[in-house]
Amino acid sequence: MSDSISVIKEKLSEVTSENDPFFQKCIQDERKGVEKLVQSVRRKWEKEAKLLVKLKEMTQYETDLFQQGYKYIAGVDEVGRGPLAGPVVAAAVILPADFSVVGINDSKQLSEAKRDALFEKIKKEAIAIGVGIIEHDVIDQVNIYEATKLAMCEALNQLTPEPDFVLIDAMPLRYTEAELSLIKGDTKSISIAAASIIAKVTRDRLMQMYDEKYPGYDFANNMGYGTKKHLLGLDTIGICPIHRMSFSPVKESKLHFDSLN
């Protein structure tokens, strides 16, 4: 083959099958550069095949429910149970039956750029999205477990149309009789994964905003979790208005600064 490496790379970007005549010619090309391109294309196809398998696995619950006659299946997930500051945020998402986005997964396993791109995709294509935000003071009043349930119910209450089946990550909600709680549901259900992404991006953006309002805790990077920089902020500055007073490190910081007065 007389084509240059750069030309071959360009042509291979449009090849989709091992049986493509051009790809077969590339296999026969003994140049090291072409061999590397062939290996790269094969790795790309292997990755894409795995993502398609994962997508099929993650739509299985929804597919079964659609076949049973359910029309509006809501996935529900939360983010922010563990942080020392900020709200707990839950999202509920109803996706159309033909929603098919390769790469969607538990939000914690995705890069920020990938989450942001999927966030926009979900917002554009979802039938309905609800977001529940329960602030730090309510968390202190009712405990984080109950606050999480409140956030989930708030998110579900915002959905129009109302869901006729609810898939929930991990915790039983008892929002409706037609619901199923899935352990690690954000890796098993595309609806829950979508809710996970909506909740994560929503809360991260809130915490980035709070970082500007309350500097010194590194909220933009730790999202309120108890990292070294956050704990250092508690030790040197004390608490701020969005800290959860019922969480031990925050409580200890307040006691320390109160004792100095």
From Swiss-Prot:
Where located? Answer: Cytoplasm
Quickly give the catalysed reaction: Endonucleolytic cleavage to 5'-phosphomonoester
What are the UniProt keywords, alphabetically?
Answer: Cytoplasm, Endonuclease, Hydrolase, Manganese, Metal-binding, Nuclease
Q: How is the cofactor bound?
A: Manganese or magnesium. Binds 1 divalent metal ion per monomer in the absence of substrate. May bind a second metal ion after substrate binding.
Gene Ontology BP terms: DNA replication, removal of RNA primer; mismatch repair
- For whether the record's keyword set contains Coiled coil, the answer is no
Residue span(s) of domain RNase H type-2: 71-259
Record-linked Pfam families: RNase_HII (PF01351)
Known InterPro entries for this protein? Answer: RNase_HII (IPR022898), RNase_HII/HIII (IPR001352), RNase_HII/HIII_dom (IPR024567), RNaseH-like_sf (IPR012337), RNaseH_sf (IPR036397)
Q: Where does a divalent metal cation bind?
A: D77, E78, D169
Q: What is its EC number?
A: 3.1.26.4
The molecular function GO annotations come to: manganese ion binding; RNA binding; RNA-DNA hybrid ribonuclease activity
Domain of life of the organism in this record? Bacteria
The cellular component terms of Gene Ontology attached to this UniProt record, alphabetical and capped at eight, are: cytoplasm; ribonuclease H2 complex
This protein's cofactor list reads: Mn(2+); Mg(2+)
- Disulfide bonds, paired cysteine numbers: none
Enzyme group, top EC level? hydrolase
The record ties this protein, via NCBIfam families, to:
PRK00015.1-1, PRK00015.1-3
Functionally, this protein is described as follows: Endonuclease that specifically degrades the RNA of RNA-DNA hybrids.
Q: So what family is this one in?
A: Belongs to the RNase HII family.
State the protein's name: Ribonuclease HII
Organism of origin is Listeria monocytogenes serovar 1/2a (strain ATCC BAA-679 / EGD-e)
Species classification: Bacteria, Bacillati, Bacillota, Bacilli, Bacillales
